């Protein structure tokens, strides 16, 4: 029975809802606020002096913050900002200068490889990923493995946006995108191959 009585008035069903105007809403809100303030004041007055002393001690134990911001004027702030911007302008490096110096350092190195097994191809690909040109000599490896290596390097070069060129009999030049190859010797190679046949 007690449980039934507990939930008896829990749900309120009204057949007609009253629509309050804006003035009525404001007056009801203000009445609620006044009621809340009165309840709060009653609770504060009923507090024991001991709890009041504890609150005072807690307030005293909070450290005071020094606010330098409020002491500075807008002129001082503007002066500081101007000085900071002048100092920072000397430290700015444009991206074009940085990338040019980076590419100049990286493009000056070329790696030579003579793979004996297919697993050596990963070292060649790592050098290409590090933006270094590689010259690959496949004369001392069987033709099947050489074809697999060239296929792998072609995919690597394509992925990094570079280029692969044949520069001799079973010798290939693989270059990343930061290296340009000027000239062509493939015509000369083809003429040499026809001459030997």
Curated annotation (Swiss-Prot):
GO terms for biological process: division septum assembly; FtsZ-dependent cytokinesis. The keyword Nucleotide-binding does not apply. Pfam families: SepF. Its main location: cytoplasm. Keywords: Cell cycle, Cell division, Cytoplasm, Septation. GO terms for cellular component: cytoplasm. Homodimer. Interacts with FtsZ. Belongs to the SepF family. This is Cell division protein SepF. It comes from Staphylococcus epidermidis (strain ATCC 35984 / DSM 28319 / BCRC 17069 / CCUG 31568 / BM 3577 / RP62A). The gene is sepF.
């Amino acid at each position: 029975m007690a449980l039934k009585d507990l939930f008896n008035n829990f749900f309120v069903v009204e057949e007609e809802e009253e629509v309050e105007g804006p003035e009525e809403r404001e007056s009801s809100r203000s009445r609620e606020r006044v009621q809340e303030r009165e309840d709060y004041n009653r609770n504060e007055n009923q507090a024991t002096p001991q709890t009041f002393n504890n609150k005072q001690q807690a307030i005293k134990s909070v450290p005071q913050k020094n606010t330098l911001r409020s002491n500075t004027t807008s002129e001082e702030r503007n002066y500081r900002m101007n000085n900071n911007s002048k100092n920072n302008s000397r430290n700015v490096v444009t991206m074009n200068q940085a990338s040019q110096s980076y590419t100049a350092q990286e493009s000056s190195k070329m790696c030579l490889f003579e793979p004996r097994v297919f697993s050596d191809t990963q070292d060649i690909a790592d050098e290409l990923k590090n933006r270094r040109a590689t010259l690959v000599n496949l004369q001392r490896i069987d033709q099947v493995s050489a074809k697999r290596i060239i296929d792998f390097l072609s995919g690597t070069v394509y992925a990094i946006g570079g280029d692969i060129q044949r520069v001799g009999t079973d010798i290939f030049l693989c270059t990343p995108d930061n290296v340009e190859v000027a000239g062509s010797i493939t015509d000369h190679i083809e003429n040499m191959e026809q001459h030997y046949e």
